[in-house]
């Protein structure tokens, strides 16, 4: 389970940053930056926060409602157009920088999930598997996941055939079948091979 050991080791104001949505065929990539206040963290968050991929949808949503009361949050996203123009890695870094900027605070350090730094105005420590190690990164992973899932559910209302409210834009059989039958929507990443093969022009 993640804890605050890295945050305490570094000291000062530390934010955790994570993203969701690098792999999907549709929708934006979304990042969150979170500064936790250790003195105000409820036991519920300390005991239940984990890598968002290990939590049920219900647990993620419950935790995402609790985090803002004891944290400073910043969100950033990179659009489908930006993903197609600058590639998914650079778009991920862009979303992370936007999330950091949205905090409105200068941090002594940022803990970033992954092995490549996004280029921030403060020192960065990359933590592979960070959402299972750092509580700040875990919080960022949960709130980013819940936010992006809600965005994809909204987009699904206009394009119900793709099942985005269930698959969040990932290349499930349902999604790929609809893509083959109907072709890409404006929300698809045209630079991704499974989408590009169904483009008419």
From Swiss-Prot:
HAMAP family: RNase_HII_B
Name this protein carries in UniProt: Ribonuclease HII
UniProt keywords, alphabetically: Cytoplasm, Endonuclease, Hydrolase, Manganese, Metal-binding, Nuclease
Superkingdom assignment: Bacteria
Chief localisation class: cytoplasm
Annotated GO MF terms: manganese ion binding; RNA binding; RNA-DNA hybrid ribonuclease activity
Residue pairs linked by disulfide bridges in the UniProt entry: none
Reaction(s) catalysed (UniProt annotation): Endonucleolytic cleavage to 5'-phosphomonoester
Domain RNase H type-2: 12-201
Gene Ontology biological-process entries: DNA replication, removal of RNA primer; mismatch repair
Location in or out of the cell: Cytoplasm
UniProt cofactor(s): Mn(2+); Mg(2+)
Organism: Paramagnetospirillum magneticum (strain ATCC 700264 / AMB-1) (Magnetospirillum magneticum)
Family membership: Belongs to the RNase HII family.
CDD domains: RNase_HII_bacteria_HII_like
Source lineage: Bacteria, Pseudomonadati, Pseudomonadota, Alphaproteobacteria, Rhodospirillales
Residues engaged in binding a divalent metal cation: 18-19, 113
Cofactor note: Manganese or magnesium. Binds 1 divalent metal ion per monomer in the absence of substrate. May bind a second metal ion after substrate binding.
